[in-house]
């Protein structure tokens, strides 16, 4: 077996499931206020994953109910693997670089990812 054919067995928590290389990733499970989709992963290793896709985020102006979606191209990096309570290795941080300024005023951010599924 070639070294790069080894199953890495590392996941990202996507609200209620552990997923490898998801095409869509919900960042805020409570209200789905931001979703990364059309993700294409260029690498997925035990230490980091790198991908690109599209961010759809609610601008919450004047309120989140009445807000509009802001759509941006993104580059994504998942890092800082940890063990979940259920024993799976999961990434605990996501770095996002946007192609335009977001409603929050940023063009890049680092967020904590959930490390276990919501029951």
Which role does the model predict for each range below?
Residues 1-8:
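N-terminal low-complexity, Pro/Thr-rich disordered segments
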Residues 8-50:
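Short, surface-exposed binding/anchoring microloops in extracellular/periplasmic proteins
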Residues 50-119:
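Extracytosolic low-complexity repeat regions of secreted or lipid-anchored proteins
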């Amino acid at each position: 077996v070639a070294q790069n054919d080894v199953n890495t067995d590392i996941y990202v928590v996507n609200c209620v499931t552990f997923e490898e290389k998801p095409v869509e990733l919900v960042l805020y499970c409570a209200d789905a206020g931001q979703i990364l989709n059309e993700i294409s992963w260029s690498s997925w290793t035990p230490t980091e994953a790198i991908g690109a896709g599209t961010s759809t985020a609610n601008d919450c102006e004047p309120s989140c109910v009445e807000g509009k979606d802001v759509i941006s191209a993104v580059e994504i990096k998942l890092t800082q693997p940890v063990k979940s309570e259920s024993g799976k290795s999961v990434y605990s941080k996501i770095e996002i670089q946007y192609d335009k300024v977001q409603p929050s005023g940023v063009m890049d951010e680092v967020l904590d990812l959930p490390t276990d599924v919501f029951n």
